Amino acid sequence: MGWEVVLLTIEPAEHSTMFHHPNVLWCREQAREMGLEFVSVKAKGKEEKDELLAMKQALLKMKADGVAAGAIESEYQKERIDRIAHELGLRSFAPIWRASETLLEEQVRYFETYVVAVAAEGLSEGMLTRKFDGQFVKYLKALKPAVSPHLEGGEGETFVANAPFFRKKLKIREWKRKFDGSSGAAEIAGLA
């Protein structure tokens, strides 16, 4: 028996430590290209507890049997998702948890991914909208101190515009960048 997969997106207040923020409104398009049902829920407050409550309520409303997350290195995120799943009696999956470098190499090779937020020393405004490719991974590893190539410690965020399981590529027509001198984000202003 398989699983019916639904893409659940929690729309947090800006600067969430738990959930992705830049370009979250475009997750609907990603779900469409993956052929998945899409559910989006706005967190009613700015604190972590508000975001987790939104997730918990959405999972209950959906009558979910499990929750899968893309956490790779963030104990912070994985522990909280596991806790919500446990409280609701759901199975928790993190299929790429502690994934090898091979998985990152495959993502770089087969996915079209863009850097949409930066917040670490060595990551400048010029990195925004840059393709997340092999050269970028090498750059991150060479920084002193090194930055995780998964960008999971709050160092940055990415947006996937194409993947082997997308029906067609999301063609980004325009970006709007904001940078305050030490961190910034690039929001998609439109798709072609």
Language-model segments: residues:
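ATP-dependent adenylation/nucleotidyltransferase module used to activate substrates
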Residues: 1-117
